[in-house]
Amino acid sequence: GEHTRSGDAMLLINPHTTFYFRPEIHVVSDEGLNAYGAVTWGQFFVYQGFNERTGWMHTSTYVDFLDEFIEDVSTRDGRRVYRYGNELRDVTTQTVTLRYRTTTGMAEREFETYRTHHGPITHAIDGKWVATRINWKPAEALAQSFVRTKQRDHAGFRAMMQRRTNSSNNTVYADADGTIAYYHGNFIPRRDPQFDYSKPVDGSDPRTDWQGIHEVDETVNVVNPTIGWLQNCNSTPFTSAGPDSPKREDYPVYMAPDPENFRGVHAQRVLEGVSDLTLEGLIALAYDDKLPGFETLLGGLVSAWDDTGRDDAPYAQAIDLLRNWDHRTRANSVEMTLAHHYGMQFKKHGTYPGTLRGMALIEFLGTGSVTQERVATFERTVDELTRDFGRWDIPWGDVNRFQRLTGDLALRYDDEAPSLPVGLASGDWGALASFRARRGNGSKRIYGVSGNSFVAVVEFGDRVRAKSLLAGGQSGDPDSPHFDDQAQRYVDGAFKDVPFYRDEVEARAVSRYRPGLSD
């Protein structure tokens, strides 16, 4: 809270997910449950959210929590066995019956399944069976997810984390006591570091076996860093708290192989030197429109163009726009249209090592690619924009749109149907407020499909205070008034106040329902 006007801790909750996948929920019981936030379909616990005293946000992790073991399988006396050290162990066989529906009624089919002590046989590599091992404690994982929502302080939250069944997430935490914390992963098997577990390992060698699960204290985490802030954007934990971040050399590679990305770079920039922060100020940081991914990418393009000595229209005019651009995305920005389509064109058709992803790929396209290819790709970008829209200098909001036509899972888009201009951009370029858009159903425009979905900012004072936003609306029914009633708010970044306490909820109630009763 040292950087906030109130002195209280604040939390930004912004999972970048598929639109309409995380409805906004408030669950309350007389047994002490009072949690608000986002849930994935079917979950009865608040996945990313807050209660009166604690808040939690998950990002996706690259922690290696799954391994593949190549098994040495043979047949002895009519039995399938596999080698483990000097032993031959039986392969476990189980018959699974699956019932399914056909046009004439129900049918069933039997499958033989196989497993070793490592786990089920899932596939083969070069003719050798491979067993896959993961965290398979679904009941315990479900319990941890629910217990998380009822914690009152960091001691309880850390005890919950010690259950160690959360495989796929990192966790950012804040509470009413002023504690902030970051946990990189949770379920992390202990392994022999001499082996490379990013690839399948030899299952016949006992040394490759898991050696238990790391304690929470052994994992990468940060609690109350001196700098006073924490961030993670599906990125490396080694920049999560500026100079107070954990050190890479203190941990095994499998514990944090996550690369840096442009959103992580952007988050660090906006947090450095922050002070006197309010909830509204936190929203402003979260919607900062700078896109660091274009700094190197477009710098390399402009340099390559200058090397040609050319000044022919319309390409020279387009290059000059990018040369003088501040790399900020806005709905009226022609530069953003050019930059996005150039980057996407280069990623789709460019020549680069196939192993490159994310930030490393963008940096290569900016500085490591063939200069003639940069120029040719940009020319093709300008030509295609002219073909599709009748001009190349088209504002970003005319191309980048928000549209919700149906409640179908498979979203469809229509250039002739109503839609809203959006000034946000993809997280690929470093946008903290991400809006990933693509074409669909033969459209020329691009339409948002994922990114900012449920977003909330929370301040943990004497009374918790929060603001939130949801892509489109809460309902999946096009006939509901809540199908797209938040669409304009979403586009504008105009957050609504969250009614958390009972008096706030009752003051805004439109209707009430109890089973068998309504008013």
How would you name each of these model-derived features?
Residues 181-188, 290, 294-295, 306-310, ...:
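Short amphipathic alpha-helical patches
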Residues 1-315, 321-324, 328-331, 445-519:
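Mature extracytoplasmic enzyme cores
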Residues 385-495:
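C-terminal accessory/interaction regions of large nucleic acid-associated machines
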Residues 136, 140, 210, 246, ...:
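Generic signal for short, ordered secondary-structure residues
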Residues 195-197, 311-411:
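A terminal-accessory region detector
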